[in-house]
From Swiss-Prot:
It comes from Homo sapiens. Homodimer; dimerization seems to implicate the unfolding of the three-helix bundle region creating an additional calmodulin binding site, and cargo binding. Able to function as a monomer under specific conditions in vitro. Forms a complex with CFTR and DAB2 in the apical membrane of epithelial cells. Component of the DISP/DOCK7-induced septin displacement complex, at least composed of DOCK7, LRCH3 and MYO6. Residues 782-810 are annotated as: Required for binding calmodulin. Myosins are actin-based motor molecules with ATPase activity. Unconventional myosins serve in intracellular movements. Myosin 6 is a reverse-direction motor protein that moves towards the minus-end of actin filaments. Has slow rate of actin-activated ADP release due to weak ATP binding. Functions in a variety of intracellular processes such as vesicular membrane trafficking and cell migration. Required for the structural integrity of the Golgi apparatus via the p53-dependent pro-survival pathway. GO terms for cellular component: actin cytoskeleton; actin filament; apical part of cell; autophagosome; cell cortex; clathrin-coated pit; clathrin-coated vesicle membrane; cytoplasm. SMART domains: MYSc. The lineage of its organism: Eukaryota, Metazoa, Chordata, Craniata, Vertebrata. PROSITE patterns: MYOSIN_MOTOR, SH3_LIKE. It is found in: Golgi apparatus, trans-Golgi network membrane; Golgi apparatus; Nucleus; Cytoplasm, Perinuclear region. This is Unconventional myosin-VI. Residues 934-955 are annotated as: Disordered.
């Protein structure tokens, strides 16, 4: 198969594996892996892709691959990753794989300089290239730009963001302190906003949009940082393998003894807010020695430091202090920040116990007195006031008058703990807001022309336990994915369609329904949550039940017990829900959703903190107090500030800003879950590529044009440098002249209605045209003028040459016309005078016989004069007849009559002479004359036979044409009957198609859900749920798997088995099921037969019905296989033709989609039709114009001929005759892969006028081209299938 060419087939852990096709199934291909010879497996045909010929080759832009598909995309990234080339393009989108180690010199100052002003594609892929492209686009298009850095947690978004900022400030900064401040702001923001998670050691727990502002000279003048959704819950609690924000550990590890004493710090294990997670520091050998022993936790002393090339708590503390100094923070302000951080730690160490009195409430534990003292000291609070505010809540009643009565309500231990944590989260979040504001103050700007914004926000998150923070993060990623779909897929395709470029449509999954589920007015999850917060007694259970009730049948929402992970099935329906996101299904536990959605403190704590003695603390809360001063607290009730609504508003403002800018995308990829270098997990990387839309982009860029410019925009850019004669040009014509002057290849660009578009990888040419440097523009105008002058002279030369050619052609045609006239006149004259000429020839022959008569007479002894007289009379009669024929227009019958009379006279004379000769001589002479007459008679008979044969052939051709017309009439009559039935069927087919597309979307979502569950299972050491707990759709598809004898449940599976199981589940798609259902109605079920078995049965079976069924299935598989080859052909190559396009186009389209949507009422049963016409032999000939010549000048087209011999409904022999290459001969059996796979009815040949030819015409060409020898060799090698042709040849050979 495929001449041994390798293909990519699905693999559960590597994504794809290379193999060879060894068999073609009904809806699948049998693959033999290259590394496991002798072993085979089945793969769905639409999941198999052709592989590059050189498996070790890599390309910088995936659009340069010979085959553009997800398998070659993954393999190219893998090959480049193995060579430490972590960056790859898909057109103008950058794919960045996290290497998890430092690659030397890749981000050096020399590297920065090498990318300055360079077009995309002229240097190896790099994040610097994207940054420089954004800058050049901003400068040329006079439009602000955005760079969206996206990817999963741990994929390298934060680092790539820092490299973009560093590149812009180093390359296009003013050389002042402001450039350093923008770069140095990152360590400070990371210290307060980043933390270690399970999947990332330096995970950003907030989103930021960093704007670098430029003046009219395109120099950096300032910056601004917007931040979104700090994860406040992390301040109070973390997972076992996670840490709190870096600042806490860096302060403990790196603070001087003086600061440490002032802040009363110790090792991390002594603080509640740190010791429930990981208490180890990040350090290397040198910094480990610099950290004092009393600052190390027992866990650290036991297991040692954690290693990361980018993190070092002791060294990072020093770097953070340096950054603070560079951005303008003095020592006092620096100490203020540290003081609040330490105050939060001490606040967390305050514990409560139940009070002994009957009034209820709680008291501080004795051991917490020290922590209370430290906390009050650091935050500028009174100890007693802090104690009272944490253990009681002030309520204001209105029953006692206008001013009301103040009542202190004691809090229970749990309520006091919640109040303490709420205060800690509020203080830290206000501190973070202050840090961001302070960062923004360090690079102010008065005026700004444009900006480049870099978005770094938490990637899609899916843990074993997901809460409100993950819900908001994933909601944000849904919105960003929709923006990506709109900008790259939707808007691009709409533009292509509007401009008339004819690019094939690319389908993608629209996630609008998921976004509506979350943010829709009144019924969206965020609004339901806000409504719950406003209730007198809100609860998470009531909120969850309301979500399920209002979205009972929503496709994107389901209950936890339908999760693929067993751990989620223990969650009750009112404790969580599952949302099917674009990247997969995530189960959210709604505990604390209501609490986390409220950003307000109760009145006691808010009053306490706002009245702090410390000026810095008061300043932290002043802005918040001013913003919320209109919010009045009702008696006994907390005020409500919605976190979700605030985030939604911020997110919508961000997206509005992104939509108003030009966008560049950096897709960060996480190579493995262990966060180790040089380890490539193909399956989970493939999932990231699919979820990020890279596969859809690759499909679009096969025919896409990522760069474009308006004709008028280009024209106006060059107009002021044009001379008058150029200024009069039409903008479109000017652009055409400009491209010609630059020598651009016509395949690299395409003209739309109002814009010119450039192919992927042609960014250098595009930038050359768009470069707005005055000298450069003037130079290009000169080149355009030069090209126009040259082209006009060439036109003059061409016109002169054309006139000469035209003169010669007229002369040639005149001579040809004379020659045609001469020939026709000769033919007419010949047809008119041929009977007379033939008569003269015959009579002349008779006259020649007189010499023999004279010889006979000369030997006679008696009666010579009389005989001479008779001979003389006969000669006179002959001469008279010849003269008469020459002078008069005699018919053939008249000539024949008189000729016969002369013959009779000559015969009578001859018999008289014979009497006078001796018996022997007379007998001998008579015999000779009779022989000559017999020859003449035979010749006349042969002429008559030839004439009858020609008339018979003309009659047969007329009968064939009449038969074709009769078949055409019958077909039209049948079509009229079918139209009536088809009208009823079309509505049903439309419904079926809609249901099928919906089912396909569900299957695709199920696949993503299962892949995501598999990745969670691998990272969390969990197992996918067993069959007894699977959802209904999955149970139905897996009931054929073995069941354990002990407990009746399925055995636990490895990840590879789980992935294989999912692949088999997906193979039960609607198209496959429809095919199998159709096969079930037939007498023979051939769906499990191998391709070779079908072929052998066709060659050997005598069962006519089985033979017909096998032939039908055999050719159906050929159609599917050839459709797969056509879909996955090489880029920029024509589809190989097994028959002329007019034949294959007639019935090829349905197989490209692999969907059996043909009208069942419009088909005659193929088997019945084959039995009826089984022994019919029909021959056809039609023109064969090659694809390369399709759009050439008609006179220069190279037209060949395509011959076909159909034995019944299927092709038996095929010939291709081309003027510039040897004939191509094909016979059934030996050359099935190269021959036309359609049956006679599907080709439409019987309905093509003049296509059918006589058997003799086919056989003559077949024999002349060596077909007999070719077929004989195929028969001898047992490769030819038994057909009428093979039987006839074998009988001739015998």
């Amino acid at each position: 198969m495929e001449d041994g060419k390798p293909v990519w087939a699905p693999h559960p852990t590597d994504g794809f594996q290379m193999g060879n096709i060894v068999d073609i199934g009904p809806d699948s291909l049998t693959i033999e892996p290259l590394n496991q010879k002798g072993k085979t497996f089945l793969a769905l045909i639409n999941q198999v892709f052709p592989a590059e010929e050189d498996s070790k080759k890599d390309v910088e832009d995936n659009c340069s691959l010979m085959y553009l598909n997800e398998a070659t995309l993954l393999h190219n990234i893998k090959v480049r990753y193995s060579k430490d080339r972590i960056y790859t393009y898909v057109a103008n989108i950058l794919i960045a794989v996290n290497p998890y180690f430092d690659i030397p010199k890749i981000y050096s100052s020399e590297a920065i300089k090498s990318y300055q002003g360079k077009s995309l594609g002229t240097r190896p892929p790099h994040v610097f290239a994207i940054a420089d492209k954004a800058f050049r686009d901003m400068k040329v298009l006079k439009m602000s730009q955005s760079i969206i850095v996206s990817g999963e947690s741990g994929a390298g978004k934060t680092e790539n963001t820092k490299f973009v900022l560093r590149y812009l400030t180093e390359s296009y900064g003013t050389g002042q302190d402001i450039d350093d401040r923008i770069v140095e702001a990152n360590p400070l923001l990371e210290a307060f906003g980043n933390a270690k998670t399970v999947r990332n050691n330096n995970s950003s727990r907030f989103g930021k949009f960093v704007e670098i502002h430029f003046n009219e000279k395109s120099s950096v003048v300032g910056g601004f940082v917007s931040h979104y959704l700090l994860e406040k819950s992390r301040i109070c609690v973390q997972g076992k393998e996670e840490r709190n924000y870096h600042i806490f550990y860096r302060l403990c590890a790196g603070a001087s003894e003086d600061i440490r004493e002032k802040l009363h710090l110790s090792s991390p294990d002594n603080f509640r807010y740190l010791n429930r997670g990981c208490t180890r520091y990040f350090a290397n050998k040198e910094t480990d020695k610099q950290i004092l022993q009393n600052r190390k936790s027992p866990e650290y002393l036991k297991a040692g430091s954690m290693k990361d090339p980018l993190l070092d708590d002791h060294g990072d503390f020093i770097r953070m202090c340096t950054a603070m100094k560079k951005i303008g923070l003095d020592d006092e302000e620096k100490l203020d920040l540290f003081r609040v951080v330490a105050g939060v730690l001490h606040l967390g160490n305050i514990d409560f116990e139940e009070a002994g009195s009957t009034s209820g409430g709680c008291n501080l534990k004795n051991k917490s007195a020290q922590s209370l003292e430290y906390c009050a000291e650091l935050l500028g609070l009174d100890q007693d006031d802090l104690r009272v505010s944490l253990t009681t809540r002030v309520m204001l009643t209105t029953a006692g008058g206008t001013k009301g009565t103040v009542i202190k309500v004691p809090l229970k231990v749990e309520q006091a703990n919640n109040a303490r944590d709420a205060l800690a989260k509020t203080v830290y979040s206000h501190l973070f807001d202050h840090v961001v504001n302070r960062v923004n103050q360090c690079f102010p700007f008065e005026t700004s022309s444009y900006f480049i914004g870099v978005l770094d926000i938490a990637g899609f998150e899916y843990f074993e336990h997901n809460s409100f923070e993950q819900f908001c993060i994933n909601y944000c990623n849904e919105k960003l994915q929709q923006f990506f779909n709109e900008r790259i897929l939707k808007e691009e395709q709409e533009l292509y369609q509007k401009e008339g470029l004819g690019v094939n449509e690319v389908h993608y999954v629209d996630n609008q329904d998921c976004i509506d589920l979350i943010e829709a007015k009144l019924v969206g999850i965020l609004d339901i949550l806000d409504e719950e917060n406003r209730l007198p007694q809100p609860s998470d259970q009531h909120f969850t039940s309301a979500v399920h009730q209002k979205h009972k049948d929503h496709f994107r929402l389901t209950i936890p017990r339908k999760s693929k992970l067993a751990v989620h099935r223990n969650i009750r329906d009112d404790e969580g829900f599952i949302i099917r996101h674009f990247a997969g299904a995530v189960c959210y536990e709604t505990t604390q959703f209501v609490e986390k959605n409220n950003d307000a403190l109760h009145m006691s704590l808010e009053s306490l903190i706002c009245e702090s003695r410390d000026k810095f603390i008061r300043e932290l809360f002043e802005s918040s107090t001013n913003n919320n001063k209109d919010t009045k607290q009702k008696a006994g009730k907390l005020s409500f500030i919605s976190v979700g609504n605030k985030f939604k508003t911020q997110l919508n403002l961000l997206l509005d800003k992104l939509r108003s800018t030009g966008a560049s995308f950096i897709r960060c990829i996480k190579p493995n879950l262990k966060m180790t270098s040089h380890h490539f997990e193909g399956a989970q990387i493939l999932s990231q590529l699919q979820c990020s839309g890279m596969v859809s982009v690759l499909d679009l860029m096969q025919g896409g044009y990522p760069s474009r410019a308006s004709f008028h925009e280009l024209y106006n850019m060059y107009k002021k440098y044009m001379p008058d004669k150029l200024a009069r040009l039409d903008p479109r014509l000017f652009c055409k002249a400009l491209f010609k002057a630059l020598g651009l290849n016509e395949n690299d660009y395409k003209f739309g209605l109002t814009k010119v578009f450039f192919r992927p990888g042609k960014f250098a040419e595009f930038d050359q045209i768009m470069k707005s440097d005055p000298d450069h523009l003037a130079e290009l105008v000169k080149r355009v003028n030069h090209w126009l002058t040259c082209s006009r002279w060439k036109k003059v030369q061409w016109c002169s040459l054309s006139v000469i050619k035209l003169k010669n052609k007229i002369k040639y045609r005149a001579e040809a016309c004379i020659k045609m006239q001469k020939t026709i006149r000769m033919w007419l004259c010949k047809r008119r005078h041929k009977p007379r000429i033939d008569g003269l020839v015959k009579v002349g022959t008779l006259k020649k016989r007189l010499d023999k008569f004279n010889e006979v007479v000369s030997v006679l002894k008696d009666g010579k004069p009389e005989m001479n007289k008779q001979i003389k009379n006969l000669e006179i009669s002959i001469d008279t007849l010849m003269a008469k024929i020459k002078s008069t227009m005699m018919t053939q019958e008249q000539i024949q009559k008189e000729y016969d009379a002369l013959v009779k006279s000559s015969e009578e004379l001859l018999s008289a002479l014979q009497k006078k000769k001796q018996q022997e001589e007379e007998a001998e002479r008579l015999r000779r004359i009779q022989e000559e007459m017999e020859k003449e008679r035979k010749r006349r008979e042969e002429d008559e036979k030839r004439r009858r044969k020609e008339e018979e052939e003309r009659r047969m051709k007329l009968e064939m044409e009449a038969k074709r017309k009769q078949e055409e009439e019958e077909r039209k009559k049948r079509e009229d009957d079918e139209k009536r039935i088809q009208a009823e069927v079309e509505a049903q087919l439309a419904r079926q198609k809609e249901e099928e597309s919906q089912q396909q979307a569900v299957l695709e979502q199920e696949r993503r859900d299962r892949e995501l569950a598999l990745r969670i299972a691998q990272s969390e050491a969990e197992l996918i749920s067993d069959e007894a707990q699977a959802d209904l759709a999955l149970r139905r598809s897996l009931d054929s798997y073995p069941v354990s004898k002990n407990d009746g449940t399925r055995p636990k599976m490895t990840p590879e088995q789980m992935a294989k199981e999912m692949s088999e589940f997906l193979s039960r798609g609607p198209a496959v099921l429809a095919t199998k259902a159709a096969a079930g109605t037939k007498k023979y079920d051939l769906s499990k037969w191998k391709y070779a078995e079908l072929r052998d049965t066709i060659n050997t079976s005598c069962d006519i019905e089985l033979l017909a069924a096998c032939r039908e299935e055999f050719h159906r598989r050929l159609k599917v296989y050839h459709a797969w080859k056509s879909k996955n052909k090489k880029r920029n190559t024509e589809t190989e033709q097994r028959a002329p396009k007019s034949v294959t186009d007639y019935d090829f389209a349905p197989f490209l989609n692999n969907s059996p949507q043909q009208n069942p009422a419009a088909q005659i049963p193929a088997r019945q039709r084959e039995i009826e016409m089984n022994r019919q032999q029909r021959f056809f000939r039609i023109p064969f114009i090659r694809p390369a010549d399709q759009y050439k000048d008609p006179q220069s087209k190279k037209k060949g001929w395509w011959y076909a011999h159909f034995d019944g409904p299927w092709i038996a022999r095929q010939m291709e005759l081309h003027p510039d290459k040897p004939p191509i001969l094909l016979v059934a059996g030996k050359d099935d892969m190269e021959m036309c796979e359609l049956n006679l009815e599907e080709t439409g040949l019987t309905r093509k006028r003049g296509a059918e030819i006589l058997p003799r015409q086919f056989e003559e060409i077949w024999e002349r081209c060596g077909g007999i020898q070719y077929l004989q060799n195929a028969i001898e090698s047992r490769q030819a299938r038994p057909t009428y042709a093979t039987a006839m040849l074998q009988s001739l050979l015998k």
